Every structure is written in C-alpha cells, then in structure tokens.
Amino acid sequence: MRIKAALFCVALALAGFAFAAQAQDKYPDKPIRIMAPYAPGGNIDVTARIIADKLKDVLGVTVLVDNKAGASGMIGSDVIARSAPDGYNLLVSANSLVDIPVIYGNAPYDWKTAFQPISHIQAVPAVLVVTPDSPIKTLADFVRIGRETPGKLAIADSGVGTTNHIVIELLSDATGAKYTVVHYKGSGAASIDVIAGQVPAQVDQLNSAIGHIKAGKLRAIALSSDKRVPELPDVPTFKESGVKELAGFTYSTYTGLFGPAKMPPDVLAKLHDAMVKVLTDPTTVKRFADLTAEASPSTPQELAAMLDKEDSTVVPLLKKLGIKPE
C-alpha cells in the first residue's frame, strides 16, 4: 500500500512538472502587459508603446501598455514588482529606477531584488545649451566660469532629481565648478526662460531640445553621450571638451525592459530574444532615431551592470548632496 502511495506521489509530481513545463513551452499564450509608470506622452510611455507595437508581432499576442503614474514612477513599478514572474507583466523604466528611491525615500521595493532585467532599449543624451548670442562658446568656457566665479552663472534643468539635474551635479562634482541651479517643472518651462534670456544656460534631453536647436533659438555646446550624434555632427561630447576631468564623462537617460524577479529562465530567454528582434528591426530603429534616441538591445547581465554603475556613481552623489524633492 505504501509503495502504491509513493508511486502515486511520484506520478503526481511528474505530472505537475510536465504541466509547468508545457505551460512555459506555450508562453506566451495570452496578452502581455507593459507598465509605463509615468503619465502618457513622456519618454517612458512613448518607448513602451514603440516596443509594444512591434513585440506583439514578434510574440504573436496582444501587448498592452498600462500607465500608472505617481510617486515618480514608484507606484507603477511596485505593481510589477508584486506581479507573478510569469512573463505577462513587464516594466519599462530608466535610470530613475535606481535614483528615485534615494531622492524620495520609502520605496516599497528594493530594485536590486525586485526586478529581473531583460534588455536595454534606448538611450538619449543630455545637451548643454545657451542662447545663440551667448559669450559661452565651449564647455571649457562654461567650466572656467563656474570655477572662477562660483555660483554666479545660473543654469536651468527640468526638476530636482531629473537626469538633467544629475548631469549638472556630476559635471560640477567632477570639475569643481559651481553654478546656481534653477529647477523648473519640466523642460518646456525651462527652455522658454532660457530662450527669453532669463537664464543663460540649460541642460536638457536632446529629444526635448533638438527642435529649438534646429530652429536657431538655442545653441548646443556639448553632449553627454559617448559619441557625437548624427543630428548634430558638429557638436562635441563632454569627453571632447578638453577639460581633463571630463575625459571619461558619459551619462544618458537609458530605458530598459524588466520583469518581476525569479522569472523562469526559458521565459526570460524568449523575451530577450524577442527584444533583440524588436530593437534591430529597421522600423523600430527609425522610430527611435526620429526621437534622437539610439535603439540598442543588451543581455540581461549588461542591463544589470548599467544599474549597478548608476548605483555606484550617481547614488553616492545624490546622498552627499542630500537631494530631495521640492
């Protein structure tokens, strides 16, 4: 009798294993949700929709974008952190996944253990801009003024803790130059005042500033990217500025695709392979290029390394400066 019971348990366990394996083999067989934890229309939302549009063709299922804004992305991110790790609930996020919990505090999750990186998606550099008639011609000029007259030169950003703000603080920390940072609620409001001559300089995302630059309303000084961009071939990078402290400087807003932690390896592999197809598709590449962004897939390990670098370079600076929301 005991032998029969034992055999029954073994058979039941094998059946369960076979069922689980079969379920994973069928993945995906129902709609997938991609969380964009910010309001519609922003960089994260647009990125999520471009990905969803092509991912549905690659995977053969409906892919929906869900916007849950609030707490600078932490509310929507927490929804995914608490979801089943079955590949049907995904998250598009950025550097802010690491930075925002430090700035706002009391994050409902630990990003290091709550999420599974899947692939890098795209990156957009920041650009330092001034008015066309500004005497500041180069990044070296900008740094020199910040060193010789600390705090005299004002510079606008798009808000406390944004990538634009972080770029200013990283530059200041690296060079010892000091500026009066004027925090606006969004790039648009900042650009209006810079164009009007109310503030002499601004750090903005290239995709936000490119229209003003092309129209001649703002002049680009330098880019925070690793290399020059096709849209502005004559604009040097921070690394090319001749300022020795900036010789290795690169910092961009990057986005990535994540799932909840503990995703099955085969589901992770299917999603990663699908993302490689999506991000190397000429249509997707062009859609991102039109937004001055560079589409580039990565391995899960490479995306994890990017987050770790953010944690080791930016987070200590945020803590040192005591940056908190206004």
PLM feature spans:
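Sec/Tat signal peptide C-region and signal peptidase I cleavage site
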Residues: 17-23
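Bacterial N-terminal signal peptides
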Residues: 9-17
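Hinge/capping helix and adjacent helix->loop/strand transition within the periplasmic-binding protein
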Residues: 82-88, 102-189, 238-240, 254-287
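Bacterial N-terminal signal peptides that target proteins for export
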Residues: 1-10
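N-terminal (or domain-start) structured segment
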Residues: 23-113, 152, 176-205, 212, ...
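Beta->alpha turn/N-cap motifs
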Residues: 92-97, 157, 167, 187, ...
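C-terminal lobe and pocket-closing loops
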Residues: 123, 209-280, 309-312
